[in-house]
Amino acid sequence: HKIQTVAVEPAESPVMSGGEAGLHGIQGIGDGSKFLVDLKKVDDIMVISTEDAKSRMKQLIGTGLLVGISSGANVLASERWIEQNDPDGIVVTILCDRGERYLSCM
């Protein structure tokens, strides 16, 4: 299998995929990330809504992983990407935040 690099961005602010910047609730990703990512090294971009990211975050918390909203977005993007592109493949993602920072969002 070839390694694929997949970026995740908010549906409400899909700047990396050519859309307009907008307000969203996924802290740590979004319009400013475009300048931190070399898009030539990104194979695909998954767009995840704030609502879906929060929902997946809450499901992860229910399993004992106290993570934040961007981790919910990363997990959901990973699940959707593998389902759409390589159901027998292997995905590695990063849970880059802790949920303690986002207790008011839960």
Describe the role of every protein-language-model region:
Residues 2-69, 84, 106:
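Active-site/ligand-binding loops adjacent to catalytic centers
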Residues 8, 73-81:
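Terminal helix/beta-alpha structural elements that buttress the NAD(P)+-binding lobe
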Residues 35, 79-106:
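Phosphate-binding loop/pocket of nucleotide- and phosphate-handling active sites
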Residues 70-74, 91:
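Ser/Thr-glycine-rich phosphate-binding loops at phosphate-binding pockets of nucleotides
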